[in-house]
Amino acid sequence: DLSMAIDQLDRFFVPDSKCTEIVIGSRELQLSRRIGEPFTRRLMGRIYNILVRGLAIRDITDTQCGFKCFTGEQVFELFKKQRINGFAFDVEILFLAQRAGIRVREINIEWYYMPSSKVRPILDSLLMTWDLFKIRWIHKFDSNF
C-alpha cells in the first residue's frame, strides 16, 4: 500500500547481511516516524504488540509494520512451516525465526498511514489475536531446525 516510501528500500540490504537473515522495518524505534496515523489505529497496534510480546515474540518492537526482507537458506524452512494465512502470518514467521535462532534486525522507517488500508479494526484485531493462540498451539511440538 506504499505506506513506506520506496526510496527507503535500500536500507533493508545491510552490510552485515551474512549474519542477518531477516531485516524488518519498525515504526517503534527512536528514529522512526509515523505520519498521519489516527490515535485509535495507533492504540490498536500497541495493544496487539503487547499481546504478541506476551504470547509469541519478546524481542521485536514492531511485528506488524509489513516491511520485511528475508535472505539466507534457512528462511525457506520458515515458510515451509508457516500455517497462518491472515494478517498474523508475519508474526508466525518471526516466531519460527526466533525459535530457530535466526537473527532479526529492526530498522527505523518513515511510515505513512494509508486511509485506504484494508484492515477492519475490530474484526481483524480479534482474528489476529486468535491467530496468536493458533501459532502457539500449531508449533507447540515442533522441533527446532
Language model feature labels by segment:
Residues 58-59, 81-85, 94-112:
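Catalytic donor-sugar/metal-binding loop of nucleotide-sugar-dependent glycosyltransferases
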